[in-house]
């Protein structure tokens, strides 16, 4: 196992969800546990500036992980998630598990999760889960054109379109009927949101594909969302480009992906048959 943080001069940053007093309490407990191994600072995730550390411990839920990723902005620093939220698909460790396994955590090789580069006009963002165009305002059907490698593919009619990473395949895309894709696969997933048709199905594209989404008309207000952290209006005549990032999100995992699927999402269980 290739340890990337071992040494006496390790700089650790513990970030916590400022909306949760429990997360703040756990963050301080984590800081004390890390003290023998690293120079440690603690910061509310919404108040942190540019992250300059060798490892980040994110205390909260999956939203805290996503905020941390946006603060990193493509800088490849290992992130450990300590869960005090409800689901915690990315925040795999409990506080007790993290503290009890600190030697293993400090020598673990992080998983390299594919990210997306999402650009609109002159702005760009990195995404761990997804970038998507979604209708806002009155309940009208949104019409969104899909281009792949500058070639027109189709026009989606519905509530929007999600472009997800394999990590994001268990997030919003899953709720919209998209496939579950293991994180080691390098692909882009295109999932329509509530399509007003019986024929549109999710697409799985190669990592090299460049996706472009644009409103087909101006009758419906449409917004761009990036990991739930960015909310930007997209007008007719504008477009959003999404491609695989050159950077990876480094996530320290506690257990096998399929174990997480079963324990967090109760995936793959048998029906509860009654007695014969």
What are these regions (language model features)?
Residues 3-55, 59, 67, 71, ...:
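ATP/NTP phosphate-donor binding region
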Residues 57, 83, 131, 228:
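A residue-level signal for conserved active-site and pocket-lining positions in enzyme catalytic cores
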Residues 63-69, 170-175:
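Short glycine/serine/threonine-rich phosphate/pyrophosphate-binding segments
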Residues 76-78:
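Proline-centered loop/turn at the N-terminus of a beta-strand
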Residues 87-160:
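Catalytic core of DAGKc-family lipid kinases
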């Amino acid at each position: 196992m290739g340890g990337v943080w071992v040494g006496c001069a390790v700089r650790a940053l513990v970030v916590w969800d400022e909306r949760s007093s429990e997360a703040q309490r756990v963050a301080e407990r984590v800081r004390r546990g890390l003290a023998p191994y690293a120079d440690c600072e603690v910061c509310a995730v919404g108040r942190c500036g540019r992250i300059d550390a060798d490892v980040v411990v994110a205390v909260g839920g999956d939203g805290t992980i996503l905020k941390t990723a946006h603060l990193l902005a493509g800088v490849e620093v290992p992130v450990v998630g300590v869960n005090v939220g409800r689901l915690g698909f990315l925040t795999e460790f409990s506080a007790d598990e993290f503290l009890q396994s600190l030697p293993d955590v400090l020598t673990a090789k992080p998983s390299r999760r594919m990210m997306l580069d999402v650009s609109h006009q002159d702005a760009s963002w990195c995404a761990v889960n997804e970038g998507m165009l979604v209708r806002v305002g009155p309940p009208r059907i949104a019409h969104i054109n899909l281009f792949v490698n500058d070639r027109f593919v189709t026009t989606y009619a519905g509530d929007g379109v999600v472009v997800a990473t394999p990590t994001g395949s268990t997030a919003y895309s899953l709720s919209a009927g998209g496939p579950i894709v293991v994180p080691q696969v390098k692909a882009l997933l295109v999932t329509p949101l509530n399509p007003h048709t019986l024929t549109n199905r999710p697409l799985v594209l190669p990592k090299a594909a460049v996706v472009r989404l644009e409103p087909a008309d101006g009758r419906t207000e449409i917004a761009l969302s990036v990991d739930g952290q960015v909310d930007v209006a997209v007008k007719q005549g504008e477009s959003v480009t999404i491609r695989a990032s050159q950077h990876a999100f480094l996530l320290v995992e506690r257990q096998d992906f399929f174990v997480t699927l079963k324990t967090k999402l109760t995936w793959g269980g048998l029906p509860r048959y009654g007695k014969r």
